[in-house]
């Protein structure tokens, strides 16, 4: 419960039973977005949603956010007001409140959000979803289709834009990239179903599954034909849809693992589609993608690298 909000030297809130989680994410103009492409309201939505996705991926509900802005002198006040409206939209969708923040003058426009969340309590025990809890024999699953955000980024950057792409298909891919829907309620449902291992997909399925495997000291096999990609992505990028689904990044869907009996419970608890895409295996760590004959295949992907000058969001 928020006891003291914006206006004092610090925000004050009380925490209930369970565990408190915290995350932060920064979006920098020119590296993570271009304001003329994303728009002010979508910028606010996405700045919040990248954080609520992290909290939801741990099976927690968002509580309080702190927002820090680095502003150039030429930025319009009307744009900033619209950005905050987008933030409020995102918090209304996922839960949580803005408790405070800071504003600084900066030569580069940036938005930093720090977000706290509260764990699910089952009985008297807090239950978190974690990257280090995957076990050999677990099934690997994801929420929703993958790759549309990566397709939207390609369109925004003008890379290989299909000449015959329908207007509604372009809008669908752009929305996936600029206005992602974090799976907060789904993460909480997974925690209540008994799932222990999960993370969100922000850097691409292969890259993020590799991180989960490293933390859990296990390996994984993914079947390419089971990776979910919707008809729009397949139509727009018939030669690259699998690469985008495996490595496009910024999907903000959930990746999770569980034994078969828990997976059945989790699937029944979810409102949206769940796709089982593979299985966890004993170490060595790493991810192998196979075709329908179980032969390994190589897929070129473009997962996000914070220090790679060729990686760019928008």
State the predicted function of each range:
Residues 28-38, 121-124, 167-173:
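Glycine/charged-rich beta-loop-alpha catalytic/anionic-binding loops adjacent to active sites
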Residues 1-57:
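N-terminal glycine-rich phosphate/pyrophosphate-binding loops that anchor nucleotide-derived ligands
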Residues 135-144, 178-205:
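Internal active-site segments that recognize and position negatively charged phosphoryl groups
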Residues 159, 164-181:
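A short, charged helix-loop
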Residues 38-42, 173-180, 196-197, 242-244:
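Short pre-catalytic strand/loop immediately N-terminal to key active-site residues, enriched for Gly-Thr
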Residues 73-99, 104-111, 116, 192-314:
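Glycine-/charge-enriched secondary-structure boundary and capping motifs
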Residues 15-17, 27, 63-157, 279:
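Glycine-rich anion-binding loops of enzyme active sites
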């Amino acid at each position: 419960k928020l006891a003291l909000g914006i206006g004092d030297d610090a925000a004050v809130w009380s925490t209930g039973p369970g565990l408190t989680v915290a995350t932060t994410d920064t979006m920098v103009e020119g590296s993570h977005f271009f304001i003329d492409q994303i728009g002010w309201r979508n910028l606010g939505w996405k700045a919040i949603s990248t954080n609520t996705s992290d909290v939801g991926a741990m099976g927690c509900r968002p509580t309080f956010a702190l927002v820090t802005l680095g502003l150039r002198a030429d930025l319009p006040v009307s744009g900033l007001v619209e950005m905050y409206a987008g933030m409020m939209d995102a918090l209304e969708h996922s839960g949580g409140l803005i408790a405070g923040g800071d504003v600084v003058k900066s030569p580069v426009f940036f938005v930093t959000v720090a977000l706290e969340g509260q764990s699910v309590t089952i009985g008297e025990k807090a239950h978190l979803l974690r990257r280090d809890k995957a076990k050999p024999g677990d099934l690997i699953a994801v929420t929703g289709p993958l790759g549309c955000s990566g397709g939207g980024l390609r369109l925004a950057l003008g890379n290989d834009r299909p000449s015959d792409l329908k207007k509604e298909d372009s809008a669908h891919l752009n929305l996936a990239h600029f206005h992602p829907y974090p799976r907060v309620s789904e993460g909480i449902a997974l925690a209540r179903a008994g799932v222990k291992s999960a993370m969100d997909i922000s850097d691409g399925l292969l890259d993020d599954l590799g991180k989960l495997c490293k933390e859990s000291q296990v390996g994984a096999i993914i079947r390419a034909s089971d990776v979910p990609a919707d008809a729009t992505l397949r139509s727009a990028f018939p030669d690259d849809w699998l690469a985008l689904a495996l490595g496009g990044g910024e999907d903000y869907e959930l990746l999770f693992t569980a034994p078969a009996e828990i997976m059945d419970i989790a699937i029944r608890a979810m409102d949206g589609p769940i796709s089982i895409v593979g299985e966890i295996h004993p170490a060595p760590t790493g991810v192998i993608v196979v075709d329908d004959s179980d032969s390994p295949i190589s897929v070129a992907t473009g997962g996000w690298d914070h220090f790679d000058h060729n990686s760019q969001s928008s």
